[in-house]
Amino acid sequence: MRIMISGGGTGGHIYPAIAIANQITEKHPQAKIQFVGTAKGLESELIPKAGYEIKHITVSYLRRKISFHNVKSIAKLIKGLVEARRLIKDFNPDVVIGTGGFVCGPVLYMATKLGYKTLIHEQNVFPGLTNRVLGNYVDRIALSFEEAERYFKSKEKLIITGNPIRREFLEISQEEATQKYNSGSKKHLILVVGGSGGAARINETVVNLLKKHPNNDFKILLVTGQRHFETIKLQLGKKQDTLRYNDVLPYLTNMPHALKACDLLICSAGAITIAEVTAVGKPAIIIPKSYTAGNHQEFNAKALEEKGAAIMIKEEVLNADRLYLEITGLLSDKKRLEQMAKASALSAKTQALEMIYAEVISMIKS
């Protein structure tokens, strides 16, 4: 079995690609996996760390406005198509998989033109531009949200799979997680995460909340993101009241345990975060990042809010007082928390990897 996978730019495109590769190699240890990305993208760092080889092509994103940058990008796109063609013919894959990001555009498009079997995976409610275009050419389209169906014309290509997540999120018990992160405490645990890189707006709001309300019936575990950590530490200072029960970390190496242990999650609305929180069935206050491409995080957040699993607060109206009111309102209403948790769990799609793998096998056999 020979599988080519392309996706990059952000962790939201790269981690699903790695998860799919891991699923295939677990089932077929002799399978050959070839990743294709850019030399400057995050994929060039994460893919080798995951144990896979990556080949590079030349490609750059297109801006929405006419600019000299776009002229250069078109030239790079043409070069990338030529490079992708060569890589595909040399590797001769059984299936070519794309997980989003502009880098997979030339690879998947060229694969369709050369007659190879192709599948794309879309993580968000509002699909990225690359996948919306590729949807017209590829054989199969795996979606994470039913709400994304409207953006693709060829309904017969669609399959609802959900987002691939690590198995640890499904295997950890509540008791084990609580023992690790909230043992012996009678306070509610609130986990705050702003995605893999953190979210400045969420961090600042939580800092202001802790300064205004240092003594609460809840404690906060704030994961700032590495680049925000020192700034947040300085803003909090060394006030004993503020940090007595609360904790601030640059990143979490054990997200599955922390997420399972918390009573309430405050987070941004990245597709993988949404998949993880629903997998463990937790209620959430979701604050979508306003600067994401196509405002896709707001679409993700709305989908979960409409299912009754979350409350959405837009960044433009977010402040410490509003967040505090939402937190205390939820924690004082046990029935509502339970209803949100149930709705969250019902929203989960935990068989994404198995479904994508089955689709790949079906394509190879057809």
UniProtKB/Swiss-Prot annotation:
It catalyses: di-trans,octa-cis-undecaprenyl diphospho-N-acetyl-alpha-D-muramoyl-L-alanyl-D-glutamyl-meso-2,6-diaminopimeloyl-D-alanyl-D-alanine + UDP-N-acetyl-alpha-D-glucosamine = di-trans,octa-cis-undecaprenyl diphospho-[N-acetyl-alpha-D-glucosaminyl-(1->4)]-N-acetyl-alpha-D-muramoyl-L-alanyl-D-glutamyl-meso-2,6-diaminopimeloyl-D-alanyl-D-alanine + UDP + H(+). Pathway: Cell wall biogenesis; peptidoglycan biosynthesis. Pfam families: Glyco_tran_28_C (PF04101), Glyco_transf_28 (PF03033). The keyword Membrane applies. It is found in: Cell membrane. Keywords: Cell cycle, Cell division, Cell membrane, Cell shape, Cell wall biogenesis/degradation, Glycosyltransferase, Membrane, Peptidoglycan synthesis, Transferase. GO terms for biological process: carbohydrate metabolic process; cell division; cell wall organization; lipid glycosylation; peptidoglycan biosynthetic process; regulation of cell shape. One of its GO terms (cellular component) is plasma membrane. It is a peripheral membrane protein. InterPro entries: GlcNAc_MurG (IPR006009), Glyco_trans_28_C (IPR007235), GlycoTrans_28_N (IPR004276). UDP-N-acetyl-alpha-D-glucosamine binds at T10, G11, G12, N124, R166, S196, Q297. Its EC number is 2.4.1.227. Signal peptide: none annotated. One of its GO terms (molecular function) is UDP-N-acetyl-D-glucosamine:N-acetylmuramoyl-L-alanyl-D-glutamyl-meso-2,6-diaminopimelyl-D-alanyl-D-alanine-diphosphoundecaprenol 4-beta-N-acetylglucosaminlytransferase activity. Cell wall formation. Catalyzes the transfer of a GlcNAc subunit on undecaprenyl-pyrophosphoryl-MurNAc-pentapeptide (lipid intermediate I) to form undecaprenyl-pyrophosphoryl-MurNAc-(pentapeptide)GlcNAc (lipid intermediate II). Belongs to the glycosyltransferase 28 family. MurG subfamily. NCBIfam families: murG. HAMAP family: MurG (MF_00033). This is UDP-N-acetylglucosamine--N-acetylmuramyl-(pentapeptide) pyrophosphoryl-undecaprenol N-acetylglucosamine transferase. It comes from Alkaliphilus metalliredigens (strain QYMF). The gene is murG.
